[in-house]
Swiss-Prot record:
Pathway: Pyrimidine metabolism; UMP biosynthesis via de novo pathway; orotate from (S)-dihydroorotate (quinone route): step 1/1. GO terms for biological process: 'de novo' pyrimidine nucleobase biosynthetic process; 'de novo' UMP biosynthetic process. HAMAP family: DHO_dh_type2 (MF_00225). It comes from Paraburkholderia xenovorans (strain LB400). This is Dihydroorotate dehydrogenase (quinone). Its EC number is 1.3.5.2. The gene is pyrD.
């Protein structure tokens, strides 16, 4: 029912400021999750189980991080048929993010530009929200660093967040690829990444001993990487036996949106323009890591055919975000059906 109504809903939302519409959507999803309305209105999505990172996913189509940064709408989102939900990015301390306006729609390109800057309520509130959710499916918790933490001390923020979210996560995503936190992408460099992953894996083992369970770690990387950088990241993932990698985050490239309204706004570009670049990174990663490291493919999925292409490039699972904003819950069911 809601799928047929979504074009009308979207038309109203797209008349609003992009971030205001985002917050309204979250409020609606939160209310729908509390009342059970989301499940009643959402399309029925068939099961298509996958086992990845030692976890069994109801289906291979997940929600990417960024939509629900504080984990406040997990139940409403889960009712829409996703095989897994990822929330965050969360940082140790609450922070407001970058000044508004900081989110821009580019409908002619099926794209969004954002420079949100990890705005979130902090990891303590995040954990409370996660604990309050009734959802018991696969839940990824995405962690980052505070904007005012020097890049040389970034590992401290990641380790602090990992310690706090570990007991409540099905897997934890380490986000080092947002373009909206100054110098964050430096952590993708060979030396910086090696040190960070070593520290995280050491912490993971100690937490596994403490809690009696090993929670997989996934690294989220950028699409703006050359072959040498991808090989270096792949080697580091293999060396530290990281359980997964998410490819990719938003792009800094503006080639596909040059001359469009908002096309020159600063921030990360998501949606259809990142599809090919994301798939290229996935293919190169798969060639480097073989079948050892599962890849979660994200970037520009707007149809079931797009989801199949992402899997054909080498992904084990896929995630939606911008396509979900433009197409609504029907996209979830379409992608699951295409991947059965």
């Amino acid at each position: 029912m809601f799928s047929s109504l979504y074009p009308l809903v979207r038309a109203q939302l797209f008349r609003m400021d992009a971030e205001d519409a985002h917050h309204l959507t979250l409020r609606i999803l939160g209310a729908a999750g509390r009342t059970g309305l989301a499940g009643a209105l959402a399309p029925r999505v068939p099961d298509a189980p996958r086992t990845v990172m030692g976890l069994t996913f109801r289906n291979p189509v997940g929600l990417a991080a960024g939509l629900d940064k504080d984990g406040a709408c997990i139940d409403g989102l889960a009712a829409l048929g996703f095989g897994f939900i990822e929330v965050g990015t969360v940082t140790p301390r609450a922070q407001p993010g970058n000044p508004r306006p900081r989110m821009f729609r580019l409908p002619q390109a099926n794209a969004v530009i954002n420079r949100m800057g990890f705005n979130n309520a902090g990891v303590d509130q995040f954990v409370k929200n996660v604990q309050a959710a009734r959802y018991r499916g696969i839940l990824g918790l995405n962690i980052g660093k505070n904007a005012d933490t020097p890049i040389e001390r970034a590992a401290e923020d990641y380790l602090y967040c990992l310690d706090r979210v570990y007991p409540f996560a099905s897997y934890v995503t380490v986000n080092i690829s947002s373009p909206n936190t100054k110098n964050l992408r430096q952590l993708q460099g060979a030396g910086e990444l090696d040190a960070l992953l070593a520290a995280l894996k050491d912490k993971q083992q100690r937490l596994a001993d403490m809690h009696g369970k090993l929670v997989p770690l996934a690294l989220k990387i950028a699409p703006d990487l050359d072959d040498e950088q991808i090989k270096s990241i792949a080697d580091t993932l293999l060396r530290h036996r990281f359980e997964g990698v998410i490819a990719t985050n938003t792009t800094l490239s503006r080639t596909a949106v040059a001359g469009m309204q908002y096309g020159d706004e600063a921030g990360g570009l998501s949606g259809k323009p990142v599809f090919d670049a994301s798939n290229a990174v996935i293919r190169k990663l798969r060639a480097e890591v073989g079948e050892t490291v599962p890849i979660i493919g994200v970037g520009g999925i707007f149809s079931g055919e797009d989801a199949r292409a992402k899997m054909a490039a080498g992904a084990s699972l896929v995630q939606l975000y911008t396509g979900f904003i433009y197409r609504g819950p029907a996209l979830v069911a379409e992608c699951v059906q295409a991947l059965r």
